[in-house]
Amino acid sequence: MADVKSDIEIARAARKKPIQEIGAGLGIASEHLLPYGHDKAKVSAEFIAEARKRPDGRLILVTAINPTPAGEGKTTTTVGLGDGLNRIGKKAIVCIREASLGPCFGMKGGAAGGGYAQVIPMEDINLHFTGDFHAVTSAHNLLSALIDNHIYWGNELGIDTRRVTWRRVMDMNDRALREIVCSLGGVANGYPREGGFDITVASEVMAILCLAKDLGDLEKRLGDIIVAYRRDKSPVFARDLKADGAMAVLLRDALQPNLVQTLENNPAFVHGGPFANIAHGCNSVMATSTALKLADYVVTEAGFGADLGAEKFFDIKCRKTGLKPAAAVIVATVRALKMNGGVKKEDLGAEDVDALIRGCANLGRHIENIKQFGVPAIVAINHFETDTPAEIEAVRAYVGAQGEEAVLCRHWAEGSAGIEELAHKVVALAESRASQFAPLYPDNMPLFEKINTIVRRIYRGSRAVADGTVLAQLKQWEDQGYGHLPVCMAKTQYSFSTDSNLRGAPVDHVVPVREVRLSAGAGFVVAICGEIMTMPGLPRAPSAEKIFLNEAGYIEGLF
């Protein structure tokens, strides 16, 4: 077998076009592109405002089964499908999220796709890119600094220092910072209190950036952030601290979508980056909405499996914006299905049709769940070299028995040529106008009942459980006028349950809600379930140990 090039080698060998040429293909004049070098640019707010008058194209969601720790190629399939649609003569734009440094140097790797289905410049996108994450981190931590500064200078707002809910953030996996005590060292440093750090992609500021429609909406949402409570339990908002204006200044450029290209020189927006296991898991509304005005088809993804990313895409992003997906693609891999059927990670390369069929129950559950939202779906089998013909046929047969179709895709190895069949099938599905999209629950349902609805209908658990403190907090928020908000479930991505080792399609499990957080600016309530952490830790052998600069100054080991 010939040597297989690494993702970074493939990306580095790509023949890129100037970003102005990519923009021109979308009708974006050079004066409306704010270039960051020769191969990436932001699209101006003026162009976006003008484009709003145009009709929308069709929106395609790419989601997946519950993943293995290495991911199953959802971003790769999103990029590949965008290239495939362009290959068959459709004008298509890919919309994906930006990469977080945490998983890049941790375990999962970057977020630019893989093989011959990548967005480029891959190194930039996976590292600092256009500085959006820096802007989000800075705006978030500016608010943190203003809170402690206000308390230091007399606390005119009467903030109860025991009830400061705003934590600090950084874009790195660092478990040592989950719980801290700040302002130690004497009176000159303020009043000591407990605090902590989350990863930047879990920040409410990141969620706001990704849900805001324009600068005015951004600043209003920033002002709506609840940072603390007084002793009478009344909320303190970011605008009470006069923080919203300065935060908006830091985020002004970050709000503008980033335009790049695929390996095949097709356009892609890479913008925003909330995780789907601890946040809402979708790229920005600004990028998606703008792309829909510029293309026949927009292919976007939602993080991790359909139980997390797709549910939040439908119940948060689409609910808040009026977006209506025309079709969904569920990415599955033979190896992940075998793992869901009980095969150990080190044995996934060996054929095991029986385990595969057992694991297909996980895929079937996701197909059923997508149908609950009224969106037609098709399954993409993301091909790996270790897949056998018998295993592939078993997946096809299982999906066919569910009344759906599975298409084998080789875009990782072959680019758009390897996903052309799926592109044709997706067009037929979208143009059938079979989509009857509707969210899972109504706005006026009580908050805990919304949580229970997701647990019962999506996770197939028996119920959610929470202690009296959590229930009382939800009731208080309802009394304060927040009961209409959707809920954002934070839980493990590896299972329908909160036990990451419980694979397949478990039923009647109990989902414990450990904590709830109100993201009043973003417009949802976060329910933290099981042992999930909003600041991840690094694995025993992090990817950072294998990333370095070679003698020529090029990056090696990034994936």
UniProtKB/Swiss-Prot annotation:
Catalytic activity as recorded in UniProt: (6S)-5,6,7,8-tetrahydrofolate + formate + ATP = (6R)-10-formyltetrahydrofolate + ADP + phosphate
UniProt keyword Ribonucleoprotein, yes or no: no
GO terms (BP aspect): tetrahydrofolate interconversion
GO MF annotation: an example: formate-tetrahydrofolate ligase activity
Family annotation (InterPro entries): Formate_THF_ligase (IPR000559), Formate_THF_ligase_CS (IPR020628), P-loop_NTPase (IPR027417)
Domain of life: Bacteria
CDD domains in alphabetical order: FTHFS
Keywords: ATP-binding, Ligase, Nucleotide-binding, One-carbon metabolism
Family label: Belongs to the formate--tetrahydrofolate ligase family.
Name of the protein in question: Formate--tetrahydrofolate ligase
Lineage: Bacteria, Pseudomonadati, Pseudomonadota, Alphaproteobacteria, Hyphomicrobiales
Gene label: fhs
